[in-house]
């Protein structure tokens, strides 16, 4: 963790050359260092032109200096931004001069870490800074911006507040153990549990959507040989990415292809067909296919529409652990009109394009839910947020079960654990190693 007694410095603008480059200082010596660099006047929140000089008085660069006095700054400390020409050579020289004058090189994410430690933003908001920077399209950028504005954090806090009220009622009932729960606000507890479960379910749904907007979806094409998996990948990608032949077992290795679909990135993984037997190379391909399924968010189960039941047998239980599955009957252009089709499957033809539009719609629904946004709009989220919400949901369910048996101490503990899981999202309950891991993934100047 950083120490606010030190003053840190780093280049805050993007790597490479540009019209403008920024060096950022934060800490108690920031203003003093700026003055020693040659900034004659510094008023809070005013821009001042200056020539930045080295130890011998030679001009390093000229530009603008801005001072944000504590606590009215991003980090909550005294912050000075030096804006000069975007030459990496000059920016590095300016940083070196700041270090000579008493600053030290900032670690990755240390400015955001100090903002978190000084209460300027919570952990989910700090992570959203990196998400805004890394957003690949406008929809993801807007979702990250909402998370940075606190939309996600406020909803987490709303659930946490509900759990706090519940814990007060339950722990009060423990102090009066001789009284039945119903005489001690039992109905309020049950109503509160219902409210907490509803809020958590809605928040988890929206967080899963936010994670997809941020990270995309990892979808594995799985099925027996010659079902048309490679042809379907090519059709979805809009290019001939995979080799296609009539020979079963053509695909031996995995092939990854990322496509943009309605505002999120879908990574398609073509895999070897699953069947009994095959040579050593094909068996290795099938092993890799099963390994991909262990990491998959979505299994696209591709079967030959002419005999889907026989094809299902080849897959067995390989997809059981995948949270989301979509069954696709390919080669539907070869079916007669009277041929039966599983009502739970989508009929497509990778060759003619039949059914691909419906497949796109279904993929979007699986990735982003029903498409109904919350009143606050979409926000970005991360895998750790989703996992924490799932833990909270499990503990609330367990608390409900324990209350049914009037096991108040156990119910109170489950509610405490649910509250703790929510606290991990915003950083109100976080281990130092978790904070270090999160902030170390940031840019140096953030």
Swiss-Prot record:
Record: residues binding K(+): 226, 245, 247, 250
Signal sequence, renumbered to the chain: none
Biological process annotations from GO: tRNA methylation; tRNA wobble uridine modification
Main location: cytoplasm
PROSITE patterns from the UniProt entry: G_TRME
Subunit and interaction comment: Homodimer. Heterotetramer of two MnmE and two MnmG subunits.
Protein name: tRNA modification GTPase MnmE
Organism: Xanthomonas oryzae pv. oryzae (strain KACC10331 / KXO85)
Gene name of this polypeptide: mnmE
